[in-house]
Amino acid sequence: MTRHDFVEPYYMVQLSDDDLQEMQTYISKLKNRDYHHREIIHNNPIHSQGTDVYRTCEIHYPNKNSILNQIGKKIFLDVNEKYYEYDLKDIFEFQLIKYYVGGNYNWHCDYGEAPVRGSVRKLSMSVHLTDPKEYEGGELNLINYSNYPIMVNNNLG
């Protein structure tokens, strides 16, 4: 295994056509009841009303045996082995997030409560599963080592 002296804060990985198709097939079989509405409001004294809507979306949490989990876990393990070599335990949490017109997820650092107490999120992933020609917005911004934001292309998969 090759050790890397310098590790980027992010890597772009493209899903295989087969993996993308399997994920889209899984998604096409979901019903509205499989999603949970999620709206988070936080205090913002600068905003005229004192609060901001931080996140408005529908979320599906796939079960551990789903194809979404299997493919996502495979990607995490491959990227980790190639670039990071973290000690990953078998703790993976995936969210399938669906946005409607007006939905949003404001700028945030991608950390939060781990699904298992005492564990720490080491890797995070974002995959666009809808053709970017079918929507506006959805830009993903990341911070590079120079502390500058970069916008990631909204490529499918």
Predicted features, each with a name:
Residues 77-157:
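Catalytic core of non-heme Fe(II) oxygenases with the double-stranded beta-helix
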